[in-house]
Amino acid sequence: MKMPNRDAVLDLAAVRSHLQESSGKEYWRSLDELAENPHFFELLHREFPRQASEWLDGVGRRGFLKLMAASLALAGLNACTRRPKETIVPYVRAPEEVVPGKPLFFATAMTLAGSAIGLLVESHEGRPTKVEGNPDHPASLGATDVFAQASVLTLYDPDRSQVLTYLEDIRPWSALLGHVRVALDGLRARGGAGLRILTETVSSPTLAQQLRSLLAEFPAAKWHQYEPAGRDPARAGVRRAFGRYVNPIYRLEKADVILALDADFLSCGPGHLRYAREFTRRRRPQPGAAMTRLYSVECTPSNTGAMADHRLPMRASEIEGLALSLAARLGAGPAAGTDGGAAHTEWLAAVARDLQQHRGSCVVIPGEQQSPDVHAWAHAINHALGNVGSTVIYTEPVEAAPVDQLESLSELVRDMDAGRVELLLILGGNPVYNAPADFAFGERLLKVPTRLHLSLYADETSALCQWHIPEAHYLEAWSDARAYDGTSSIVQPLIAPLYNGKSVHEVLAAFTDRPERSGYEIVRDYWKSQHSGGDFEQFWRKSLNDGIIAGTALPPISISLQTNWAGGGSAPVASKREVIESVSGSKPEAFEIVFRLDPAVFDGRFANNGWLQELPRPLTKLTWDNAALVSPATAERLGVSYRISATGGEHGRVFADVVELEYQGRVLEMPVWIVPGQADGCVTLHLGHGRKRAGRVGTGVGSNAYTLRTSGALWMTSGTILRKTGRQHPLACTQFHHNMEGRELVRATSLEEYRRNPSFANEGEAEPPKELSLYPEHKYDGNAWGMAIDLNACHGCNACVVACQAENNIPIVGKTEVMRGREMHWLRIDRYYQGSLDNPQTYFQPVPCMHCENAPCEVVCPVGATVHSAEGLNDMVYNRCVGTRYCSNNCPYKVRRFNFFQYSDWETPSLKLLRNPDVTVRSRGVMEKCTYCVQRINAARIEADKENRPIRDGEIVTACQAACPAEAIVFGNIRDPQSRVARLKAEKRNYSLLGGLNTRPRTTYLAAVRNPNRELEWVKRSGR
């Protein structure tokens, strides 16, 4: 019998009508919620959707584990650990011997796109299991991002390259050395002509020295750099403004007003962790303290834009014209000749006045993907406003050899095509996959007689090279790295290479006739040559211990703006959109395409990391896929939407319309996702998906946007044609899961209103009196643990989610299971909108277990599997749980997770290498949830008892709290009135989630406070 069609199809007209009503919902999670489709609400109101409550399919354990790869099937590793032979130095103290059950922490650093952050890595009996930020490192300040947190999973990934191969046959290291020696002997007579080296962005001092030595030995050889996430526009912009390469560093702790020109400085780019810390510390509404105001102009919603007091959606190509208009208003550019800001005159005038009024205490930050002119105008504006030396300083470049990387790669491609390359050594990267599509890098690569590739995975580039060398993970190798401010760190390994991988230093040593040297010797010898005076051994050990090399931060330099570039008589600069359209001959109805790095898989290098693939993206909440992001108005014009299936066999699945994108003869099909706040006429594609040789997790996931990315339009294109195909594609989106009912869950106001009424967050709501409760009153004689989460600080970066997953052995479940609402994350970040459909204000709300004092889950469990501890924790006793799921049904916060399958493969001994031994691995049929990191509480209690003292405030730091760069999460003893968490809970903007239910949650929230400009509209944003 055919099932009736009960799909919840999105109706954008109904959404707009609802928003225009005065009685409409003020805060909303999704477009479907506003459309008030009854089938959609049926989906939300059912605690366990049909496919999440019945085992309807025949997925067996063996079949399911194929989805897990790195998270579940670490069968390629030995169960024993392999410690490095060289002496590594643990952070703070070095015990005489390893104590079983007692973790050690080692300082190291992780480099991404040429910029490093300092880390402390937790090691259990020689096994790295968890990554934390190094509080002494200027780029991390103790915080981390999702990539650092997930890097430990990549370390144990069984899909990593495990053997050195020649034409896919396994060969020993000695065979490669012999081949290289013969090849170099033939090149040496010609000074190395025909030798090419391709790297990603290099900031390692030791690697830079090795490359310079190699080029000195082979003067006719060439070194090329290419990074798909490269900073070519930023480099070109500073060179245009100042005549040479320099490195801008922003001091946001001194900024009263910030203007972001398509810049997501809180979530990505060099120094983003520090910038997030500095920004949020100035966003707390403290008496007598000024609160930073943030303006954001962007084409696609970002984490930074979500935190803005005023956000202006605008096509990426139009931002250059706006920057020029702003420069003219502020005396930093030509007084006339551009109308780039004509459509937003009122908005631009108010921003210009605000910047003028805060001369010397404001800053303009250009986006990494914006044009060189936008960067140059931003520097000119900062110079004109007197910000240089205050909110922005300049140093010498952090990179070892800053170049135009696109031109560098283009030169290599031309040489390969002309047959001028005889030996190509590719150190890292995957140019066959991510080079500009018009370069046809794979075809040109096959013209090179000898090709060698060093990489973590046997990827698309490795497949076209004769020699593939397995690369050692950064937790397995010695190296060094530089942070955004030039601070150098020694990268020290915590475990010997699991697959006999080689570091980049060891591979280059083979090209300089020193193949016997280890990475440890190479790095140590370099720093010994740089050390002058004093005891080198003491210097070396201190550098390893601290995680930074003292005195290596680059000092500020004096620099002058190029007067011949921004002179008053210069001709007006055409907008990037005009330039592109004049070249491509685009039609008015054509769309602009914007390329962005994926918030989870980055440029594609993390595609095989299951933690990151299953991580809900901050704004879209998509997992295991990418989509073409469009505005509601664009979706209406194209006639595209999505539907939520409400039929029995597909209950809860999202099916999005598929469109065909055509640009310069290149065609790509992708599903569409509607994003409130997206610039109209602009389509955003996230890079990093559609891999063909990523591994069992990442291969075939999503669509490859690199196929539309050309050298002439790396970050934006105009003239792209979109066609509706009539097909639909299933997407795994979590924004429809775990819906909470009740009063507005997010509470926010303006700074002006907050100062008039500090208690706004609790107006009209009073918690029921304790004596009216049917629950027994708990008596607490000792510590009483609680948490406060500041909604004014959280910008939705997701670091806490991955940190929780790594700390608590939380498995991934795969795309199909996510579509059934079975994801296992203990901590979720709900995203809420407020205001208009086309430009809403965005808020993020982390939701862990509330650890209620009157916990609804405890009273319904028939076997006492969820109980109340003496310190107020809502504990889980896993071996009692029989899987009734009554507790989850009765939880108003929807924070409990059930193991419908045996998601965690605890039978595989090698999996112990990854897992935290202090946390129980759960089995099928067991409920689980946030525990407030009870293992960390117990460890601190044991230490305090040994020293006969109470637990100090701040001694216990939960995994989510430790990872957060914004310090949005604070944990501690609420019975201590002097503790930080108690002081936060005493603030008037502190409120309980669903407090009217009398659950008395231990986790509470601090309401968000925005700082809008009175000249501009805030709540009902006009978008002018």
What is each stretch, according to the model?
Residues 288, 310-416, 527-536, 540, ...:
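Active-site phosphate/pyrophosphate-binding segments
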Residues 1-342, 349, 598, 602-605, ...:
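N-terminal export/assembly segments and adjacent metallocofactor-ligating motifs
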Residues 529-620:
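Long, low-complexity segments enriched in small/aliphatic residues
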Residues 457-491, 823-824, 829, 895-911:
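Flexible glycine/proline-rich, aromatic-decorated loop/lid segments
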Residues 419, 433-463, 467-476:
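Hydrophobic alpha/beta core scaffold segments
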Residues 489-552:
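Long, C-terminal catalytic modules of enzymes
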